[in-house]
UniProtKB/Swiss-Prot annotation:
Pfam families: SlyX. This is Protein SlyX homolog. Belongs to the SlyX family. NCBIfam families: PRK02119.1. The gene is slyX.
Length: 73
């Protein structure tokens, strides 16, 4: 095989590797964007649930120390 042909084959292999890496990079970027979207959504939900819990705790429910013990005590 001539040196010219070997070089052309090597260049072709490198071009294919670059194409696959570009595709993989695009897929990973898409996955990262989706994960960040999911994280942002979960943070909003967590804040909402934390506020609901605060509201629940500060409602008219007596704390455990204020509750009268059950009759079997």
């Amino acid at each position: 095989m001539q040196i010219q042909q070997m070089l052309e084959n090597r260049i072709e292999e490198l071009e294919m590797k670059i194409a696959f890496q570009e595709q993989l990079l695009d897929e990973l970027n898409h996955a990262l964007v989706q994960q960040q979207f999911d994280i942002d959504k979960m943070q909003v939900q967590l804040r909402y649930m934390a506020n609901k819990l605060k509201d629940f705790q500060s409602s008219n429910i007596a704390s455990q120390s204020e509750e009268t013990p059950p009759p079997h005590y």
